[in-house]
């Protein structure tokens, strides 16, 4: 079976395509697909961009403090879940607070390798096309909070399931 493919279309026309890995982080993938299908990410920004590290988006408030109103269990090794997908350039992973089960909608795309994140965050996909778009986003001038002065707006995120049957995500109510 083929893996689902997401397409992130930026307001400026840039396109990032990524393959999701349900065999590595099934609930994380199901949650992401559910949010995509609800149009959750449409119009949001990459609010945190750090050269040599990653770009982060998926916060409805654009501050890094927001989420979907619930969280999901962290599917990563230090949280008792086997996940061997390394945080190398192009990998998608879920942002979270200190608590291991605090991820919701915020995600990041690695623009460089960050082995210190391996086993600590739920990696769940990888860019297969348009990595140069992420590289352009991370090169934007930012304020002291790593937020680009010019909003990097996600126009839409869509998913091609390619035969994958997404299930209702298991959530933890806030």
Regions found by a protein language model. Name each.
Residues 1-174:
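Cyclophilin-like peptidyl-prolyl cis-trans isomerases
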